[in-house]
Amino acid sequence: MEKEYSPKKIENYVQEFWKKNKTFEVKEDPKKEKYYCLPMLPYPSGKLHMGHVRNYTISDVISRYQRMLGKNVLQPMGWDAFGLPAEEAAIRNNTDPFSWTQKNIKYMKKQLQSLGFSYDWSREITTCHPEYYHWEQWFFTKLYEKKLVYKKNSLVNWCSYDKTVLANEQVIDGCCWRCQNKIRIKQIPQWFIKIRNYAESLYQDLKKLTHWPENVKNMQRNWIGRIKGFEITLNVFNTCQKLKVFTQRLDLLMGVTYISISSCHKLSINLSKKNELIKKFIKKYRYISQEEQYKVKYTGINTNLFVVHPITKKTIPIWISNATHIEYGTNAVLSIPGHNENDWNFAVKNNLKIKYVIFNPDHQEPKLYTSFLDIKGTLFNSQEFNGLNLKDGTEKIKKILYKKKILKEKINYKLQDWCISRQRYWGTPIPMAKFKNGKMIPIPENQLPVVLPKIRKNTNLLQQAINFNSKWAEIFIHGKHAIREIDTFDTFMESSWYYARYTCPNFNTGMIDSIASKYWLPVDQYIGGIEHAIMHLMYFRFYHKLLRDFKLVDFDEPVKNLLCQGMVLSEAFYKIDSNSQRKWFNSSSVLIKRNTKGEIIESHTQKGEKLIYAGMIKMSKSKNNGIEPELIIQRYGADTIRLFIMFSAPVESDLEWKESGLKGIYRFLKKLWMLIFNYIDIKNTHKKINFDFLNHQQSELRYQLHKTIAKVSDDIGRRQTFNTAISEIMKLVNQLSKAPIKEEQDKSIMRESLICIIKMLYPFTPHFCFFVWNYFNNHSSIDNEKWPIFQKDILSKKYSTIVAQINGKKRCATKISDSLTKEEIFLYIQNQPIIKKYLEDVDIKKIIYIPKKIINFVT
């Protein structure tokens, strides 16, 4: 063992060993308990960033820990390889997306391997490879056969910059989630999967996810938007038409003063064909996103039609409103301005009647702006329902409407069907075709996969690609000429089932091998960012339910435990250029002046230009504040990065990247290295500890060791507070570095402690621990070692803190085992260096001892 810690030499050696011995490749083993740990697969953008490194380090720590518990651990890795960024990057670099993507994968794989992640690379998948998306296409045709997919002209979110459709979940504040450009609403033919058919199970099964973060589940509940209420069928006055309206509050029925329908309602469309004002209104407000509906000022137009109130028989006007959201299911709602703020604003603006029908509990005044969840109050101004509380009023109205056969209870959802077609080249071709008569037909199974046409130059639209390879678009199905569908799948399709394919990546006779999937699924631990809470994780759960219903997987949910790590933040600097745009500078090229607290007070470029400090913000290419993992590895080693990432912040919190913290971790590893180098004589420290003859210091050290094992085991295994686990290990190392090595017992305890420390650090710093382990055990690799087990009997021993005084003045406080005799306690404390100094050459006249509290030497 060399005296100096040299991470580069060690890490290269260890990584080569793992690669040569295929250490982390696994197979199904019914005799062993399985553990499937899955980090979200990366998009091969070109280089890993520290956000990736954090995600994958967390996953690797969990995987290595579970492996040490004796489990058969699967931790795979692959590439979410289709998508818009690769297509645009290929255009910029005058190449094709496939070549660009493969080049990036090669580089990023090398980066991952340099960080020592324990992946089973034999299961690597790349979603742009036909052998992967073949089965995605096959499954789509099965969904089509079961009428779970359909194509229709649809209002869609259109990004003019990217020239493609966005799902509702991909629109943030009215802008494209990727390029941040404003979206517009457009009507084009689109493919959809009926996720609304699964809305109830997606909502209810959230209760089964007991080990998912509550905020993620709440975000999904809100997006599904389950609304329980009633659908009432009303007669349109002086016509044969019926109008179905939705309400959550039957008790307020007597307060309805107008009906509000959306511009998308069938009645609105029909009226627009004859009424130019309605036509203009619909044109203005129909083509806005759901998100924008919440922001526009409420306005409307009178249809001059009426419905008949089902109880009073009075007529109620029908208005088309831009505030009636399609999320309510019927596009038509009862409006009760006396008890709803939005309805009140609309009524005041349009001079509509306002009627109050609920008194406050004290019966003194009408109750305004009643919440849908508010069930306190008394009905008035409601004819035969006057004086009833709201619950009784609801029941009485319900009976009347049921008797008329115009009422049914209904649950509506905000969740809309999943739009899965995209107008781009670099994606999975949708396996459908159209005959000359317009009939759609799925591509037959024996003609799958439908492989993308090869292109000779970069392009951004599939239609242009087809122009280069016109034969690709033409196909014969059952002897008839047909034209292929030219849209491609939303890339969320690929990332919705990859977890299942990892269990059988080389299975070529079907989508999923039932034997492998039954063994490995569900995923035991999934790790990814909170930004995926709605889009990816919703589709992920939905797709699993589809696979389940086709008997391809078991279980109702794909993942048991979900961990959402925080972002990685870094210092960012910019200046305003001549075009009033921000130009960002990487901190490595910035001259920084700090105050005594370490706070930045000035920053300049190398040329002396003054910069503005933007604070600690998320690492990103756009802000030029990313840190290259390779540079840190070269300087400090992969283990230092790994340990720093896991130590610097709780995994759910944002992590502030500071090189000073890296240096501190590096010093710790060097300190531990020297402790092993200096204090362990490998040949002479194999003697067993004689537990019958341990002095107090030895007993205390063993107590701290097993206390640390217990705490670290709980922190990693149950609490997932990895930073506190590392902190406990560091404390123990500090104690060991101060422990005297005077006799064989000391050496044996030191050996026991170091062995346990190495095992506990192994998930965090696997290269370091692999290497030093060889000096403790030449017979097996640490990769095959078991996690240390704490001894309960040691921790159950009781200790008391005894204050030592000389002539009544406190000199020290010492923790002492309650099992020691009074004489042993006296002797031990007298030999403490600080006490020994004061008692040297002094006669002790008396010892005053209060058990478990105070010992006072009187001289």
Swiss-Prot record:
Q: What class of enzyme is it?
A: ligase
Motif 'HIGH' region, residue numbers: 42-52
Primary location group: cytoplasm
Biological process terms from the Gene Ontology for this record are:
leucyl-tRNA aminoacylation
Instruction: Please give the Gene Ontology molecular function terms for this protein.
Output: aminoacyl-tRNA deacylase activity; ATP binding; leucine-tRNA ligase activity
Q: Which residues bind ATP?
A: K621
Where found in the cell? Cytoplasm
'KMSKS' region: where is this motif?
618-622
Q: Which UniProt keywords apply?
A: Aminoacyl-tRNA synthetase, ATP-binding, Cytoplasm, Ligase, Nucleotide-binding, Protein biosynthesis
What reaction does this catalyse? tRNA(Leu) + L-leucine + ATP = L-leucyl-tRNA(Leu) + AMP + diphosphate
Q: Which family does it belong to?
A: Belongs to the class-I aminoacyl-tRNA synthetase family.
Name the chain's protein: Leucine--tRNA ligase
In its UniProt entry, the species of origin is given as: Buchnera aphidicola subsp. Acyrthosiphon pisum (strain APS) (Acyrthosiphon pisum symbiotic bacterium)
Corresponding gene? Answer: leuS
